[in-house]
Amino acid sequence: MGRAVGIDLGTTNSVVSVLEGGEATVIANSEGSRTTPSVVAFAKNGEILVGQSAKNQAVTNVDRTIRSVKRHIGTDWTIDIDDKKYTPQEISARTLMKLKRDAEAYLGEDVTDAVITVPAYFEDSQRQATKEAGQIAGLNVLRIVNEPTAAALAYGLEKGEQEQTILVFDLGGGTFDVSLLEIGDGVVEVMATAGDNALGGDDWDQRIVDWLVDKFKASQGVDLTKDKRAVQRLREAAEKAKIELSSSQSANINLPYITVDSEKNPLFLDETLSRTEFQKITQDLLDRTKTPFNQVIKDAGLSLSEVDHVVLVGGSTRMPAVSDLVKEMTGKDPNKGVNPDEVVAVGAALQAGVLRGEVKDVLLLDVTPLSLGIETKGGVMTKLIERNTTIPTKKSETFTTADDNQPSVQIQVYQGEREMASANKLLGSFELGGIAPAPRGVPQIEVTFDIDANGIVSVSAKDKATGKENTIKIQDGSGLSQEEIDRMVKDAEAHAEEDKKRREEQETRNQAESTSYQTRKFMDENSDKLPEDLKTRVTEAADAVDEALKGDDIEAIKSAVEKLGTESQELGKALYEAQAAEAGAEGAAAGEAAGDPNVVDAEVVDEDDENKEK
């Protein structure tokens, strides 16, 4: 059995962690960083880039670089690359595959299982899609865990067995959650959770982009939003400025050659953004965090004085305005001993350990973030499971028909808090037919909701009279069938083989270039010691390598390198022989000097002996 890891699949960055000796370790990626940008790019040569390498080339490959795809997961969004449509699951799977690969390189073992985290306020379709992304990446997804719960698990287990109430304020790159949890004696229980799936650091970045666009338009009369490359450069500069403003009072944004004017003259952008101005243009975003915060306190039925610890999660909580607001709302200083970028992945690794039996005496009790119900007469939302119900859970309720002799019922499943069903999120629908003819109100239809530990919903309907039953595992328009998942897994595996082959080919080319260069350099440095015919042969072999490198035939390159290697061995042999001959000539010269009558042999006199003679 392979190893299990914990993965924080983030909007802007992702992290992977593993249990070693009972302790969670965050794994550095192949570039040496502990966080991996959640960016995927399709290079023009067919290579798929993931992480920092994808982020680095975004400006020159805007249309084929995908970032923040987590904001689309669970929807029917697709992107068309080379006449092929990619779903958010497939793009997310690329990031997961890189994390898996980097973990395997670190561990020296296969990674087969994973606990993947999601925002607490993710609805069913988003959770299902995240699980599918894991499957496409070749992972057995042990559990989908809420990010604040994972963070509290990592934080709480370090605090021992004393009971405590923890408020987790999680502001990531694309989503926001706030959760209240009770931890004690190995039990982590979520009391309430709320959030906003469309609020995160990306929105703060966008405000800086908008500010820069307005400034540039006012000064230069040019709208930068019409230039995709310029917008990408603005995005990258905005993110850097936001980070800089967390520790400085101002940030200078200088982008030379950002675009050209109508006469093709280059234009430059140079602006200074103060922290005060930044907070002013993003104040409404900050205010949006207050409603979920107040909702959680209300739902949990607690006063703020009963909260023992406040934990900040997500890189966006590093903004001073965010931590100041949290302190203002809670009356407590947020805990500084937690790395907001890594704590979620650490908690996920601990949960993986719990599920694999490697961590004992820990129980995680999560909740469903939104109410679940069905549409009943008049379009009313009839809730079967209220929000903040501990999962896994199962609930049944009996309904009846609205018309005489109604042969079937349509079960429409919704998720949300609004009173009318149409105002909530439709998760799916199915039909229960074969109902025995009867006056309205007589048939008894039992509807059962079942939520598993991943927060994924199944619904069944049963006619009590006939025993006829129908079940649906919620899978809306964005859901993938098992056949589609299997196809995507094979596609991902094929790409992995292609990528491996491409890497090997590039390594062969690099080695060939290096061998040719080093051989020529060696000949130049030792030219006077090497025979002309050998130099000619080696030069021809090196030329053959250079010629092969111009083509795409990897076997031809390998063959040319092999031939050059054989000829190069003769270089070493010839140089050795030349040095030996030179040494012999020097020895002969020394011998001649020994027989010269003009050379006087010196007598060595021991100083002590000389003194004795005196």
UniProtKB/Swiss-Prot annotation:
UniProt entry tagged with the keyword NAD: no
Q: Specify the species.
A: Corynebacterium aurimucosum (strain ATCC 700975 / DSM 44827 / CIP 107346 / CN-1)
What high-level taxonomic lineage is stated for the organism?
Bacteria, Bacillati, Actinomycetota, Actinomycetes, Mycobacteriales
Name the HAMAP family for this protein: DnaK
Q: Which Pfam families match?
A: HSP70
Sorted alphabetically, which keywords does the UniProt record give?
Answer: ATP-binding, Chaperone, Nucleotide-binding, Phosphoprotein, Stress response
Q: Which family does it belong to?
A: Belongs to the heat shock protein 70 family.
Which segments show compositional bias classed as Basic and acidic residues?
491-510
Its biological purpose is as follows:
Acts as a chaperone.
Ranges of Low complexity composition bias in the record: 581-602
Name of the gene = dnaK
Please give the residue positions where the record annotates the modification Phosphothreonine: T175
| Coiled-coil spans in chain | none
Please state, per the UniProt record, what induces or represses the expression of this protein.
By stress conditions e.g. heat shock.
From the UniProt record, which GO molecular function terms apply?
ATP binding; ATP-dependent protein folding chaperone; unfolded protein binding
Supply the name of the protein.
Chaperone protein DnaK
Stretch list, region Disordered: 491-528, 581-614
Query: Compositional bias of type Acidic residues: which residue ranges?
Result: 603-614
